[in-house]
Amino acid sequence: MISLSVLSGIAVRKLGYKKTALSGAVLMGLGEFLASWTTKHVGALFVFHGVIFGIGGGLCIFSCSTAPLRWFKKYRGLAMGIVFGGGSLGAAVMSIATNLLVRNLDVAWTFRILGFMLWGVCIPASYFIQQPKGSASANLKLQWYRFKEPRFLLIVVGTAISCFPLFIPPYFIPIFSRSMGYSNQIAIVILAAWNLASTVGRVLGGYTADVLLGPLNSLVLCLLFIGLSSLVVWPLASTVGIFSVFLIFNGIGCGAFFSLVPPMIGATMGAENTLGILPILWTTWFCGFFFGTPIASGIYSLAGDTRDQGVEEFRPAAYYAGAMSLVGLFFILYIRFTQTKRLLVRI
């Protein structure tokens, strides 16, 4: 989905938000419906659930997540946080609902129900996604020339590296929960709790960027949450209490990242340039989203005998996630202090 950000940006510029979101909604439902008839064929699932659904999701997500930037000037971060928060809240609900559907029906009917739900919700919703009347599309033009600017390159590298650990926790939380003796059903509920923390982080991060600390300071704090929770808390999470602390702080940090990057671009590159830069930046995140979790999984598989799982088997993956977050943080800190060296300033 994220790899289509540039194409989605072009589609929005040519077709508008409504038609782009409508096209995405149709493709998402179609991909799930067709996948329901091919549950035993990996190649067909790759095409239907991977490609068709992925293209539709890319079009929908881009339309939904960038439209608020056209409407809001003062509270952009909060607007983005509410939109992205809806996504993580949906993930919390659907993780439990999908698990129940698979248990009580089967995979095929789960795909079909999800497809009909996507059509029933996303198609009507697409008609409400519009840009302000009289607003021009000139600032939607992709600003490829930014690659000549050192500050933009630092933003690209810093945020791209920071993407590597973002989806490691939701992949490992069910596995880690089962290693602590919980059932599969409880593990899914624990994953939903992480998604709820992510929802809070997305909304709270946007509010913090707009009102309290500023976008850059908020992004620094967000990456600290991700890095320290992975390096310090997760490796010691041998009890439910410590694991809960990890779920809360890591979920808040991972969620806030998504709502903080757009206002951070506005603070560093100019608010009027955000929509011309954001599709390019999001496309560069593909490597982190695609390779981050498989690398962590490979590290975990090399950690020891997985038949007798304990906290120590997960520590290398946790250290990897935390280290990648802190490396990304160093780039953001450099950008922050090139803006101003004063510590107690909202930026």
Per-region residue spans from a language model:
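Intracellular juxtamembrane helix-capping segments at the cytosolic ends
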Residues: 50, 57-72, 79-80, 169, ...
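Structural signature of the two symmetry-related core transmembrane helices
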Residues: 19-33, 216-232
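Extracytoplasmic gate region of multi-pass secondary transporters
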Residues: 148-209, 215-217, 257-258, 262, ...
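Helix-loop-helix hairpin linking two adjacent transmembrane segments in secondary transporters
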Residues: 74-75, 82-133
